[in-house]
């Protein structure tokens, strides 16, 4: 049983690219296709798996600039490092992602910054 726990720990530490490579290697070794198995197995267990796994990467999406557009543009520039024109285009083109693949803590911090400036923000 300890070997299985160790294996689970090692598999959990794989990056997405490493997991994809592992899937390809197992498909070749066993002569199967993971796509068919996932489609059949994911239907009944999809909701349960989503409830168990907590999202680790978030995208901070600017839903609307609100009344204080200039303040929001300043915050977007500070967060992203974009130039004035690029930040203005992003704010005026809302809803748009401001920052992608960030941790939950960082996403919450960025959301608070943008909301303080007057923006409406979503985390996805």
Swiss-Prot record:
InterPro entries: Ribosomal_bL12, Ribosomal_bL12_C, Ribosomal_bL12_C/ClpS-like, Ribosomal_bL12_oligo, Ribosomal_bL12_oligo_N_sf
CDD domains found in the cross-reference section: Ribosomal_L7_L12
GO MF term (any one): structural constituent of ribosome
Family: Belongs to the bacterial ribosomal protein bL12 family.
Function: Forms part of the ribosomal stalk which helps the ribosome interact with GTP-bound translation factors. Is thus essential for accurate translation.
Subunit structure: Homodimer. Part of the ribosomal stalk of the 50S ribosomal subunit. Forms a multimeric L10(L12)X complex, where L10 forms an elongated spine to which 2 to 4 L12 dimers bind in a sequential fashion. Binds GTP-bound translation factors.
Protein name per Swiss-Prot or TrEMBL: Large ribosomal subunit protein bL12
Organism per entry: Xanthobacter autotrophicus (strain ATCC BAA-1158 / Py2)
């Amino acid at each position: 049983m300890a070997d299985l726990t160790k294996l689970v720990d090692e598999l959990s530490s794989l990056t997405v690219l490493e997991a994809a490579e592992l899937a390809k290697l197992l498909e070749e070794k066993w002569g199967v296709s993971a796509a068919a198995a996932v489609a059949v197995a994911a239907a009944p267990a999809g909701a349960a798996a989503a409830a168990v796994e907590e999202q680790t990467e978030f995208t901070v999406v600017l839903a609307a600039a609100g009344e204080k557009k200039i303040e929001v543009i300043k915050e977007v520039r500070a967060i992203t490092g974009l130039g004035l024109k690029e930040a203005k285009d992003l704010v005026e083109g809302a809803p748009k992602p401001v920052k992608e693949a960030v941790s939950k803590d960082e996403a919450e911090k960025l959301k608070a910054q943008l909301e303080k400036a007057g923006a409406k923000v979503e985390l996805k």
